[in-house]
Structures are given as structure tokens and as C-alpha cells.
Amino acid sequence: PSQEVLDKYKDLVAATAEFMYSFATYDELEGRFVLKGAIPAQETLRAADTVNPPFELSYWHYAISVAQKWRERLGLERNLQWDEMLDKLSPLAYQDGLYLAAETATDTYKDIRFTSDHMAVLGAYGILPKCPLVREDIMQNTLDWVWDNWNWGKTWGWDFAMTAMDAARLGDTEKAVGALLMDKRTNTYLPNGHNYQDARLRVYLPGNGGLLTSVAMMCAGWDGSEGENPGFPKDGNWDVRWEGLQPMP
């Protein structure tokens, strides 16, 4: 970003990072920062009972990392407290090789409440770039389980885009395309372009935004991706053309 952009948003970035730092709780006994009391993106989890939801943990790490880079670009030293959080933020909780909906959701794969709504765990390495909290092998296992077993009848329009972005980053391009083309009611787009959810909700802009973002990412790539159109299968069946897009982080 230009110096003008750095100066314009420096106070907003710093204040956001300070809030995020203050919101987390430091567990003295285990020597780690934990997140609790937040309303998770997967709305079937209750904020009062939820500790360390995976998407939010990854978002904390990403946002604090961006705030540190902002300081460096301004010629400032890194904030030592923020660095401590980056080093000691809780990793994503997993069980039997699968990421949990939250550290406290130990019945993630037994209770349909945890396998309905947004599969936000995939957003931890889909919407967001890879961070040290995420292991790709466990995320691939989780994607495969979600693909085969999720309660897809209880999803929302942007869930398909989130799944596609996770699959693309993992190199599972067949699932990336398959997610965007999945034949589910909430993945319906009407002739006027609106993402139909049900008779009550015929306009759902998060679905449109998710579709546009995921396709752009699959075309232009992301930091560390290789080759052209990295989110599409290289089986000779795709002729992808685009212009004016920038890679995702």
C-alpha cells in the first residue's frame, strides 16, 4: 500500500488489533491465549459455551499479523505484546485427525448441531491464508469428511464458496469446482442473479459475494499458489479466461 493508505488507516488497524489482543484471554496454566465469549461464524454454537472456534482463531492470527506488518511499513517497531499472542495463540483443536467445530465441541462429528449451518472450520484455511495454527493434512481430512457427511440441507449460500476456497488451497481442484456447482437449494442462482435460499429469503448477497470471491481466487491464485488458474482441474476440460484480478493473500 502507498504511504497515503498506510497513514489513512493506521489508527483503525492499530485500534482493531488492540481490541483483538484485549479480547483474548491468557491461560497462565497452559501458557496460551484462548478465545471465548465470541459468537462464532458457525451460528449453531453458543457464544457462552464456546472456546477456541477454528475460523476465529485463524482470523485472530491473520489480523494481528497484518497489524504488525502495518507497523513495520510505517517504520515502527513490532508490538511485543502482539508478537507474544502470535506465538502463543491456541492451535486449532482436533480429534481423530479431524478439526473440531470448537475446542469445547468434542462431539462435533456425533451431534448434528455441529455439522449443520456454516462449516466454518474450512474457512480457517480457505477464506483465510495458511497460518501456523493449521495443519494441511488434518484440514484435508476435515474437508473430505465435510464433503461426504455434512448436513448440506442446512447450509447457506456462501458455504459453497468457502468450501471451494478451502479445496483450492489444498490442491483438491475437483472439489473446488464441485462445491461451486453443487446441486443444493441454497446454491441456487435465479435468472436475475440472486442467490435463492428459500421462499422467505430470495435475496442473499453473501452467496453472491462468496461466489465472485472464490472464482476470482481460483483464477488469479493466492500467495504461494503456482501456475495459471490454480483452482481449476488440469484435465483439459476447462478453458478459463479472466482479466483485471489480483491474487488473494
Name each region found by the language model.
Residues K8, T25-L35, L76-W82, E228:
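Short, glycine/acidic-rich hinge or "gate" loops at secondary-structure transitions
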Residues T25-Y26, D49, F114-S116, L245-M248:
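A general structural signal for short secondary-structure junctions and capping/turn motifs
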